[in-house]
């Protein structure tokens, strides 16, 4: 199975380098010996323009297993990332990342990152992962928006 997953991840890397959405980045991490680790990717997701997320590029780690693409990657923002659909551990709660829901082996890294970007400004109140963000999102949108804007300043675009 490792052969299938590493071949698919190599292909994904090639496709990403050839064509990826503006402002995003996604690259395999580097092992201590300098070789690429195709199973752990460092990614950045820009906030959409004209949203409270604009101005930030949000760091995300994508971790793949040797069962990829049969099983989805695990996607994590930094610990305590403020969003209704992100667990305190940073793990993203999104249906396309759920094997029992909408995951399909045809889903690409690009599709996942675009889906997470969309989730940032369009949280799913039916699938909350954190108490405070969902509470503010539903009951005090002004305070929620203030926290989101403050978070965008914590994650400026890379220079």
Swiss-Prot record:
Its EC number is 2.3.2.-. Keywords: ATP-binding, Nucleotide-binding, Nucleus, Transferase, Ubl conjugation pathway. SUPFAM superfamilies: UBC-like. The keyword Transferase applies. Pfam families: UQ_con (PF00179). InterPro entries: Ub_conjugating_enzyme, UBQ-conjugat_E2_core, UBQ-conjugating_AS, UBQ-conjugating_enzyme/RWD. Its main location: nucleus. GO terms for molecular function: ATP binding; SUMO conjugating enzyme activity. GO terms for cellular component: nucleus. It is found in: Nucleus. The active site is at 93 (glycyl thioester intermediate). GO terms for biological process: protein sumoylation. SMART domains: UBCc. Pathway: Protein modification; protein sumoylation. Residues 4-157 form the UBC core domain. Accepts the ubiquitin-like protein sumo from the E1 complex and catalyzes its covalent attachment to other proteins with the help of an E3 ligase. Belongs to the ubiquitin-conjugating enzyme family. This is Sumo-conjugating enzyme ubc9. The lineage of its organism: Eukaryota, Amoebozoa, Evosea, Eumycetozoa, Dictyostelia.
